[in-house]
Amino acid sequence: MEELIQKALSSSNKVSNNSLIEKIIPVGGGCIHKAWSIHFQNGKRVFAKSNYIDTINMFKFERECLSVLKRFANESYICVPETIDLISYQNLSILFLEWIDLKQCQQNVLGKGLALLHKSSSEWSKKNFGWEEEGFIGSSTQAKG
């Protein structure tokens, strides 16, 4: 899998910034996608999620949602990762995100950030909660989710 990710990365300068890959390390935490920490020789580090190509719509939806959430996040309290690229390569889809070091986070600060995120996004859309389009919760489709 690491070899496929390396080959996929060769097609995207957005992720690598012309730097060579130093190492690709699997990281845990999810049950739908495989997750990776990718280290580049220039010191840059990114988070990647990979799955089969038929799940690319889940990644497209996640990319869109993260982009919108980032507008509402108060970065003094909570960070929403920047989406770097979404690549299709052979039978693989890979979503590349900004790496966020979670070891430096405090739960009470994250809780306040999450509350502020909900507040500011609900003020933007007073009609209701949810999303304008069909989406996903995990691998399940979600109507206006």
Language-model segments: residues:
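Juxta-kinase regulatory segment immediately upstream of eukaryotic protein kinase catalytic domains
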Residues: M1-L20
